Amino acid sequence: MIPRLPRYFLKYFIIFTFFCVTFCFLKLCLGENGVEKKNHKTIEAYQYTHTFIHSAYYYPKSKSLGENAVVLVTTMNKRTMWKILDYKINMIGTNQSTHHTTRASLSTEHRIIERCDYMLIIAQTNSIDNMDKLEIEAEGVLVEIPYKKPIYIAPKPVIFCVSPQFAAEQWQTFLVQLHVSKRYGAHLQLYIVSMVESYFNLISEYEKMGLVSIEPWLTIKFSSTDGPYLEPNRNVELRNQAGAHTDCLLKYKESASFIGSLDMDDILIPNNANSYYEEFEREYAGSQFISALHYDKYDYKTIKVSELRSQSLSAIVKNAERLSTKDTGKSFVRPERFNSTWSHWSRAAQKKPIYLDGYEKPILRELKTISNNGMFHLKNMYLTEFNDLGIGQIPLNPTDNVTQLIEREHLAEIDADMKRMLSMPSISKLADSLPKEEFYMPIIFKCYNESFYHLRDTNQMRPDILCVNAYSCDLPQQVGNRCVHSDATYHSGPPMWPISFHFATNSFFSRDIGCYQ
């Protein structure tokens, strides 16, 4: 005879089983103290490496990064592991009452197949309200990272980010770039590695007037390590120019309407527009499908004179001769559409899916190459006596060979403004100290040509074979004409696996280092 079960046994058994299953499920999904336990993908590291943090930004609010965004601009060794972009960095944000740990995703403007071992890596996450402390954590080891907030009021709606200058001496190019940009409504953000002191003093006078912002671009240094490491400056693309351009983009992305990345000798003159803002708005035309505006660079040779009082944009323009070559162009962007950039354009500019409110499917933005304008690239400038200058004509726009490169009225305005400013006592007193002849430029050009220009110009440069870098260029120091060089207080965090982090504070310009990269 089968024994009879107690009354309601089945009901109690079902309830008991339900609670047991629920308890086991919660134990699996929750860690201690009720904190959610996430099953993160394990990334196997190959080696212990070092990363230099150029800058860290905290955005309480952002148009494109979200609230409490944190972004790090770094030079990182991609060979730390097989797929460096799969790695996540634990970041801890702390405010007055609590702390919050998130895992920052990594991205880059470079292709992983490229030869350079070090490359620009962006680390991005969203942290905590009113953050007042930022730390990186790995296996219980912490390092505090200094950070800054972006600029929320831009000097002008258009910002031009100029590539880091090293052993810079051609001050005439700066005057052209500054006065053309000033006339058409752009503010220059300039990064300097090293520069002839008198040239630096000239730029500093323009900085005092609010026409240019100067920032040291630091040589990468690991101040303390517990073993040998691969030298980063020699194994990264051109002093990590992309890092400087990305830093500039992040600095102004909440305040500027347009941001461009260019070299000092890349001169952009609007076509059939009174300002850069007018031209960029016209070319974007309110479209959500345009990622960036891309301008080709047309090479020119022209003259330069050594006397400060004789500087004239008209003389440079009217003695310019178009060369048969073109150089890789530059891009100008709406900053809310990008979080990083390469030196010429962002890798995210072409066919990257973007999800917008009200759209069920992503849109694919594309780079727009400007067909009716290009950059006036001052590729070669030859010293000429002022009295020997010829009187030529304004060159034609290289894209149509019909319109003039610059309107006569605008050229006259810029000349008058340049003459007025160069006659100011604070600037005119620098005339005798500025370089009167070339010293570093021929050396650098020769080294660049031997290192990679000859390969680029013959279409033989393969990024998977050659790391574009000229750190080994031998730069002799010029007697009696010293340079300023970027410097800072360098810091190294504790050893961490697999990456130890290094950074700098209190950057400044030193007169005791010399003209080096």
UniProtKB/Swiss-Prot annotation:
EC category: transferase
UniProt keyword annotations, A-Z: Glycosyltransferase, Membrane, Transferase, Transmembrane, Transmembrane helix
GO CC annotation, single: membrane
Origin: domain of life: Eukaryota
Ranges where the GT92 domain occurs: 156-454
Listed EC numbers: 2.4.1.-
Organism expressing this protein natively: Caenorhabditis elegans
Keyword Hydrolase: no
Main localization category: membrane
Family (UniProt): Belongs to the glycosyltransferase 92 family.
Keyword Hydrolase: no
Subcellular location: Membrane
Protein name in UniProt: Glycosyltransferase family 92 protein F55C10.4
Topology of this chain in the membrane: Single-pass membrane protein
Record-level Gene Ontology MF annotations: glycosyltransferase activity
Spans through the membrane: 9-31
InterPro entries recorded: Glyco_transf_92, GTase_92
